[in-house]
Amino acid sequence: MDPRLQRLIDERDLRRLAELYAQGADRRDKALWSSIFTEDGLIEAPGIRLEGRANIVGALDAMATRYLATQHRVHNQVVQIDGDSAHGETYSTADHVAIGAEPRTVVTWSIRYQDRWRRVDGGWLFSERRLVIDWTETRRLD
């Protein structure tokens, strides 16, 4: 295959993982999240470090106890691919509606994910996601 075509396919596959991550987070879909991380995957966020696929997937239970709803959106993504590994940055915004907050509010996070991926058995998976939160905004819901 032409290397330029392979690069386009790889870039699309990496972006698709970011989109599936967002969908899995918002639907609290453990099977989906399990399918997009390596067994030794890592998520880091301010005050949080989750190591291993089981711990990452388990974080969805914690999200369900804190947030009535979330909505993650994937924006631009820049990646560097080197054979069967890749790294890059994925921009995102995520809305979080807290359980029990009165008045009801939504907190928006502006996120830059520092991502690493590995190709495993012919398909790409996240090996690391490090969240950098650039800013937050809290607003009341009507």
Whereabouts are the PLM-identified features?
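A solvent-exposed, acidic/Ser-Thr-rich amphipathic alpha-helical stretch
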Residues: E11, K30-D95
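Beta-strand elements of well-folded, non-transmembrane domains
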Residues: A94-A98, W117
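Charge-dense, low-complexity intrinsically disordered segments
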Residues: R4, L8, G47-L50, R104
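Short beta-strand edge/turn micro-motifs at domain boundaries
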Residues: H87, W109-R140
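Short, low-complexity N-terminal intrinsically disordered segments enriched in polar/charged residues
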Residues: M1-R27, A31-S35, E39
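Short, conserved clusters of charged catalytic residues that mark active-site
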Residues: R16, V74, R112
